[in-house]
Amino acid sequence: MNNPDDVLLINRFLRQQHVLTLCAGSGMDMWCASCFYVFDENQMALFLMTEKHTRHSELMLINPQVAGTVATQSRTIALIKGIQYRGEISLLSGDAEQAARNRYCRRFPVAKVSSAPLWQLNLLEIKMTNNALGFGKKLHWSRVEPL
């Protein structure tokens, strides 16, 4: 069972940030990328835009299981906050793609000139470090319902 207080803090953090590190892999081939994202807390999902011909996208099309981080850049140890996540990503199409694109372009207006596809990263597991709550404080969330 997810702790409601942890969920509130995790959601607030994901709403406040906008860049994630995404790690994809298949077999011995792995690659990471930094991407802008929009958080959908109702679905516990992140929407991101990236071309299909990139190395990380080609890997995601083979293996949709991904992992990554969302972190602040604090120079003060007591203020460090960050998330490690595991999820499943899929390329959007049709109405779902258009809805995600509209939402993404509202957050990042410069994206209106891009035709790059939108992806939905369904979060499966999150561990958040929040030193503002005490050094090394960890918050956890995991998806309880199947996708």
Curated annotation (Swiss-Prot):
Instruction: Show the SUPFAM superfamilies listed in the entry.
Output: FMN-binding split barrel
Signal peptide (residue range): none
- Family classification: Belongs to the UPF0306 family.
Q: What is this protein called?
A: UPF0306 protein YPO3467/y0717/YP_0616
- State the organism named in the record: Yersinia pestis
Q: Which InterPro entries match?
A: Split_barrel_FMN-bd, UPF0306
